[in-house]
Amino acid sequence: MSRIKEAFQNGKAFIPFITCGDPDLGTTKEIVKVMVDNGADLVELGIPFSDPTAEGPVIQGANLRALKGGVTTDKIFDMVAELRKEVTVPMVFMTYANVVYSYGIEQFAKRAAEVGMDGLILPDVPFEEKEEFAPAFREQGMDLISLIAPTSHERIAMIAKEAEGFVYCVSSLGVTGMRNVITTDVGAMVKLVKEASDIPAAIGFGISNPEQAANMAEKSDGVIVGSAIVKLVEKYGKEAPSHVAEFVKSMKDAVRES
Protein backbone atom coordinates (compact mmCIF):
# COMPACT_ATOMS: atom_id res chain seq x y z
CA MET A 1 0.00 0.00 0.00
CA SER A 2 1.29 3.46 -0.87
CA ARG A 3 2.10 5.85 1.94
CA ILE A 4 -0.70 8.10 0.64
CA LYS A 5 -3.35 5.40 1.01
CA GLU A 6 -2.03 4.64 4.50
CA ALA A 7 -2.82 8.24 5.51
CA PHE A 8 -6.51 7.38 5.20
CA GLN A 9 -6.32 4.16 7.23
CA ASN A 10 -6.76 5.69 10.70
CA GLY A 11 -10.07 7.46 10.25
CA LYS A 12 -10.65 10.74 8.46
CA ALA A 13 -7.53 12.45 7.13
CA PHE A 14 -6.68 16.10 7.67
CA ILE A 15 -4.59 17.49 4.80
CA PRO A 16 -3.13 20.99 5.16
CA PHE A 17 -1.55 22.95 2.31
CA ILE A 18 1.31 25.44 2.60
CA THR A 19 3.11 27.54 -0.04
CA CYS A 20 6.84 26.82 0.16
CA GLY A 21 9.03 29.84 0.82
CA ASP A 22 6.45 32.25 2.24
CA PRO A 23 7.90 34.05 4.16
CA ASP A 24 11.02 31.84 3.78
CA LEU A 25 11.89 28.14 3.56
CA GLY A 26 13.07 27.95 7.18
CA THR A 27 9.61 29.02 8.35
CA THR A 28 7.93 26.64 5.87
CA LYS A 29 9.94 23.78 7.35
CA GLU A 30 8.91 24.69 10.92
CA ILE A 31 5.27 25.00 9.86
CA VAL A 32 5.27 21.55 8.25
CA LYS A 33 6.72 20.05 11.44
CA VAL A 34 4.12 21.68 13.71
CA MET A 35 1.30 20.69 11.34
CA VAL A 36 2.39 17.07 11.56
CA ASP A 37 2.81 17.30 15.34
CA ASN A 38 -0.78 18.58 15.57
CA GLY A 39 -2.41 15.87 13.53
CA ALA A 40 -1.79 16.43 9.80
CA ASP A 41 -2.07 13.03 8.09
CA LEU A 42 -0.69 14.16 4.73
CA VAL A 43 0.86 17.50 3.75
CA GLU A 44 0.50 19.38 0.46
CA LEU A 45 3.48 21.56 -0.42
CA GLY A 46 2.89 24.28 -2.99
CA ILE A 47 5.77 25.04 -5.35
CA PRO A 48 5.29 28.72 -6.24
CA PHE A 49 4.50 29.73 -9.80
CA SER A 50 4.15 33.24 -11.24
CA ASP A 51 0.68 32.62 -12.71
CA PRO A 52 -1.19 30.20 -10.41
CA THR A 53 -4.53 30.08 -12.26
CA ALA A 54 -6.43 27.84 -9.80
CA GLU A 55 -5.63 30.05 -6.82
CA GLY A 56 -7.52 32.91 -5.25
CA PRO A 57 -5.82 36.10 -3.99
CA VAL A 58 -4.51 34.58 -0.72
CA ILE A 59 -2.44 31.81 -2.30
CA GLN A 60 -1.54 33.97 -5.33
CA GLY A 61 -0.04 36.49 -2.91
CA ALA A 62 1.95 33.75 -1.16
CA ASN A 63 3.29 32.53 -4.52
CA LEU A 64 4.48 36.00 -5.46
CA ARG A 65 6.06 36.68 -2.05
CA ALA A 66 7.92 33.35 -2.17
CA LEU A 67 9.22 33.97 -5.69
CA LYS A 68 10.26 37.50 -4.77
CA GLY A 69 12.17 36.00 -1.83
CA GLY A 70 14.24 33.89 -4.24
CA VAL A 71 12.64 30.46 -3.81
CA THR A 72 13.47 27.90 -6.50
CA THR A 73 12.31 24.34 -7.13
CA ASP A 74 15.79 23.04 -6.23
CA LYS A 75 15.78 24.90 -2.90
CA ILE A 76 12.39 23.33 -2.16
CA PHE A 77 13.73 19.84 -2.97
CA ASP A 78 16.60 20.47 -0.53
CA MET A 79 14.15 21.58 2.17
CA VAL A 80 12.07 18.41 1.68
CA ALA A 81 15.20 16.26 1.98
CA GLU A 82 15.87 17.95 5.35
CA LEU A 83 12.24 17.56 6.45
CA ARG A 84 12.25 13.86 5.62
CA LYS A 85 14.79 13.28 8.42
CA GLU A 86 11.99 14.12 10.88
CA VAL A 87 8.66 13.83 9.08
CA THR A 88 7.22 10.46 8.08
CA VAL A 89 3.70 11.38 6.89
CA PRO A 90 3.14 11.42 3.13
CA MET A 91 3.85 14.69 1.33
CA VAL A 92 2.67 15.72 -2.12
CA PHE A 93 3.60 18.69 -4.25
CA MET A 94 0.95 20.95 -5.70
CA THR A 95 2.19 23.05 -8.58
CA TYR A 96 1.60 23.90 -12.22
CA ALA A 97 2.54 22.10 -15.42
CA ASN A 98 4.94 24.85 -16.40
CA VAL A 99 7.05 24.36 -13.26
CA VAL A 100 7.46 20.65 -14.02
CA TYR A 101 8.03 21.22 -17.76
CA SER A 102 10.73 23.81 -17.24
CA TYR A 103 12.55 21.51 -14.79
CA GLY A 104 12.11 18.52 -17.12
CA ILE A 105 9.36 15.98 -16.35
CA GLU A 106 11.69 12.99 -15.80
CA GLN A 107 14.22 15.02 -13.82
CA PHE A 108 11.49 16.52 -11.62
CA ALA A 109 9.97 13.09 -10.90
CA LYS A 110 13.37 11.56 -10.14
CA ARG A 111 14.42 14.37 -7.79
CA ALA A 112 11.03 14.46 -6.05
CA ALA A 113 11.25 10.72 -5.39
CA GLU A 114 14.86 11.01 -4.18
CA VAL A 115 13.92 13.55 -1.51
CA GLY A 116 10.97 11.46 -0.36
CA MET A 117 7.87 12.97 -1.98
CA ASP A 118 4.85 10.71 -2.48
CA GLY A 119 2.83 12.41 -5.18
CA LEU A 120 1.98 15.43 -7.27
CA ILE A 121 -1.14 17.51 -7.96
CA LEU A 122 -1.23 19.61 -11.15
CA PRO A 123 -4.48 21.62 -11.08
CA ASP A 124 -3.99 23.05 -14.57
CA VAL A 125 -3.57 19.67 -16.29
CA PRO A 126 -6.89 18.18 -17.44
CA PHE A 127 -7.45 14.48 -16.86
CA GLU A 128 -7.09 13.78 -20.60
CA GLU A 129 -3.55 15.20 -20.60
CA LYS A 130 -2.23 13.63 -17.43
CA GLU A 131 -0.55 10.75 -19.30
CA GLU A 132 2.04 13.25 -20.47
CA PHE A 133 3.23 13.40 -16.84
CA ALA A 134 2.02 10.19 -15.18
CA PRO A 135 4.52 7.62 -16.57
CA ALA A 136 7.58 9.49 -15.23
CA PHE A 137 6.03 9.70 -11.75
CA ARG A 138 4.70 6.15 -11.84
CA GLU A 139 8.20 4.92 -12.65
CA GLN A 140 9.41 6.62 -9.44
CA GLY A 141 6.59 5.11 -7.36
CA MET A 142 4.74 8.42 -7.02
CA ASP A 143 1.03 9.12 -7.49
CA LEU A 144 -0.30 11.77 -9.86
CA ILE A 145 -3.41 12.88 -7.99
CA SER A 146 -6.54 13.79 -9.95
CA LEU A 147 -8.92 16.62 -9.17
CA ILE A 148 -12.65 16.14 -9.69
CA ALA A 149 -14.82 19.23 -9.99
CA PRO A 150 -18.63 19.25 -10.25
CA THR A 151 -19.16 17.63 -13.66
CA SER A 152 -21.11 14.82 -15.36
CA HIS A 153 -21.63 11.47 -13.61
CA GLU A 154 -19.80 9.66 -16.41
CA ARG A 155 -16.76 11.90 -16.15
CA ILE A 156 -16.56 11.56 -12.36
CA ALA A 157 -16.69 7.76 -12.69
CA MET A 158 -14.07 7.75 -15.46
CA ILE A 159 -11.61 9.87 -13.44
CA ALA A 160 -12.22 7.89 -10.23
CA LYS A 161 -11.50 4.55 -11.96
CA GLU A 162 -8.12 5.81 -13.21
CA ALA A 163 -7.16 7.82 -10.11
CA GLU A 164 -4.01 7.23 -8.04
CA GLY A 165 -3.35 7.94 -4.35
CA PHE A 166 -6.53 9.80 -3.52
CA VAL A 167 -9.10 11.87 -5.37
CA TYR A 168 -9.17 15.61 -4.70
CA CYS A 169 -12.85 16.58 -4.84
CA VAL A 170 -13.23 20.29 -5.51
CA SER A 171 -16.05 21.59 -3.32
CA SER A 172 -16.77 24.69 -5.38
CA LEU A 173 -16.13 25.94 -8.87
CA GLY A 174 -13.74 28.82 -9.26
CA VAL A 175 -10.47 29.46 -7.49
CA THR A 176 -9.20 28.44 -4.06
CA GLY A 177 -10.11 30.62 -1.12
CA MET A 178 -12.20 30.76 2.01
CA ARG A 179 -15.95 30.43 1.53
CA ASN A 180 -18.68 31.29 4.04
CA VAL A 181 -20.99 28.70 2.53
CA ILE A 182 -20.11 25.70 0.37
CA THR A 183 -22.97 25.15 -2.06
CA THR A 184 -21.84 22.28 -4.32
CA ASP A 185 -23.44 18.91 -3.55
CA VAL A 186 -20.04 17.51 -2.81
CA GLY A 187 -21.55 14.53 -0.94
CA ALA A 188 -23.14 13.33 -4.18
CA MET A 189 -19.79 13.76 -5.94
CA VAL A 190 -17.99 11.61 -3.34
CA LYS A 191 -20.74 8.99 -3.61
CA LEU A 192 -20.14 8.73 -7.36
CA VAL A 193 -16.39 8.36 -6.76
CA LYS A 194 -17.07 5.58 -4.26
CA GLU A 195 -19.37 3.75 -6.67
CA ALA A 196 -16.62 3.73 -9.29
CA SER A 197 -13.57 2.99 -7.12
CA ASP A 198 -12.34 2.21 -3.61
CA ILE A 199 -9.87 5.12 -3.74
CA PRO A 200 -9.99 7.60 -0.83
CA ALA A 201 -11.81 10.86 -1.63
CA ALA A 202 -10.81 14.12 0.09
CA ILE A 203 -12.64 17.45 -0.22
CA GLY A 204 -10.88 20.78 -0.68
CA PHE A 205 -11.32 24.42 -1.86
CA GLY A 206 -13.00 26.86 0.50
CA ILE A 207 -12.88 25.04 3.86
CA SER A 208 -11.81 27.51 6.53
CA ASN A 209 -13.26 26.62 9.94
CA PRO A 210 -13.79 23.55 12.17
CA GLU A 211 -17.54 23.46 11.51
CA GLN A 212 -17.05 23.27 7.73
CA ALA A 213 -14.24 20.73 8.20
CA ALA A 214 -16.46 18.45 10.32
CA ASN A 215 -19.29 18.76 7.82
CA MET A 216 -17.04 17.86 4.87
CA ALA A 217 -15.34 15.02 6.78
CA GLU A 218 -18.75 13.41 7.33
CA LYS A 219 -19.18 13.25 3.56
CA SER A 220 -15.68 12.03 2.62
CA ASP A 221 -12.43 10.34 3.67
CA GLY A 222 -10.53 13.55 4.32
CA VAL A 223 -10.48 17.33 4.30
CA ILE A 224 -7.96 19.63 2.56
CA VAL A 225 -7.35 23.15 3.88
CA GLY A 226 -5.09 25.70 2.21
CA SER A 227 -6.08 29.37 2.08
CA ALA A 228 -6.96 29.62 5.78
CA ILE A 229 -3.44 28.40 6.68
CA VAL A 230 -1.70 30.56 4.08
CA LYS A 231 -3.62 33.58 5.43
CA LEU A 232 -2.20 32.91 8.92
CA VAL A 233 1.29 32.79 7.41
CA GLU A 234 0.65 36.07 5.59
CA LYS A 235 -0.54 37.67 8.84
CA TYR A 236 2.14 36.38 11.23
CA GLY A 237 5.15 35.77 8.95
CA LYS A 238 8.03 34.14 10.83
CA GLU A 239 5.85 33.97 13.97
CA ALA A 240 3.26 31.85 12.11
CA PRO A 241 4.22 28.31 13.27
CA SER A 242 2.52 28.52 16.70
CA HIS A 243 -0.65 30.05 15.17
CA VAL A 244 -0.76 27.40 12.45
CA ALA A 245 -0.23 24.67 15.07
CA GLU A 246 -3.27 25.86 17.03
CA PHE A 247 -5.43 26.10 13.90
CA VAL A 248 -4.40 22.66 12.59
CA LYS A 249 -5.15 21.09 15.97
CA SER A 250 -8.67 22.59 16.01
CA MET A 251 -9.31 21.39 12.44
CA LYS A 252 -7.96 17.89 13.06
CA ASP A 253 -10.10 17.60 16.21
CA ALA A 254 -13.18 18.60 14.19
CA VAL A 255 -12.36 16.11 11.43
CA ARG A 256 -11.64 13.33 13.93
CA GLU A 257 -14.96 13.82 15.72
CA SER A 258 -17.07 13.88 12.56
Residue spans of the language-model regions?
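Hydrophobic faces of well-ordered beta-strands that scaffold small-molecule active sites
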Residues: 14-18, 43-45, 91-95, 120-122, ...
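Catalytic beta/alpha-barrel core
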Residues: 68-71, 116-129, 143-151, 157, ...
